[in-house]
Amino acid sequence: MFIGEYNHSIDSKGRLSVPSRFREELGDRFILTKGLDNCLFVYSMDEWKVLEDKLKKLPLTNRDARAFVRFFFSGATECELDNQGRIRIPNNLRSHAYLEKEVIVIGVATRIEIWSSDQWGQYNDDSNLSYDEIANRMEELGI
């Protein structure tokens, strides 16, 4: 399971060091794709397969389903870590997530999210949910 929040930097070649705690669970190959909320999602191959199977079952006749599948798959790329535990993030994905130099890498149970430091701060400021509101929403979801 991926948990935690880490501050990292992207170098001039678009490479990001993956937190060492995440590397073993990611495996040799993994998927990097556009995420929601202006971030990137990183999935192990096993988790990607689970998501892929669910997305393949969405009805082709549903416009929203088609749009979501296009969004997710068009941005996806298979990645490997280099010898120093880094991934190269393609330009189109860096643009999608507004990634420049300072980034936040977070573990979100089954995936990793990569955020621009500014976007992560803005997301947290915009949320402005109290712990009570979050607890109420979790209760509505059965958690």
From Swiss-Prot:
Q: Which UniProt keywords apply?
A: Cytoplasm, DNA-binding, Repeat, Transcription, Transcription regulation
Q: Fetch the Pfam families from UniProt.
A: MraZ
- The signal peptide here is none
Can the keyword rRNA processing be found in this entry's annotation?
no
Residue intervals of the SpoVT-AbrB domain: 5-47, 76-119
GO molecular function terms listed in the Swiss-Prot or TrEMBL record: DNA-binding transcription factor activity; transcription cis-regulatory region binding
| Annotated compartments | Cytoplasm, Nucleoid
Which InterPro entries did the record assign?
Answer: MraZ, MraZ_C, MraZ_dom, MraZ_N, MraZ_sf, SpoVT-AbrB_dom, SpoVT-AbrB_sf
What processes does the entry annotate via GO biological process terms? negative regulation of DNA-templated transcription initiation
Among SUPFAM superfamilies, the record links this protein to:
AbrB/MazE/MraZ-like
Q: Give Gene Ontology CC terms.
A: cytoplasm; nucleoid
Presence of keyword Disulfide bond = no
Sequence similarity: Belongs to the MraZ family.
Q: How does it assemble?
A: Forms oligomers.
Provide the protein name.
Transcriptional regulator MraZ
For this protein's source organism, the top of the classification is: Bacteria, Bacillati, Bacillota, Clostridia, Peptostreptococcales
Q: Which gene is transcribed and translated to give this protein?
A: mraZ
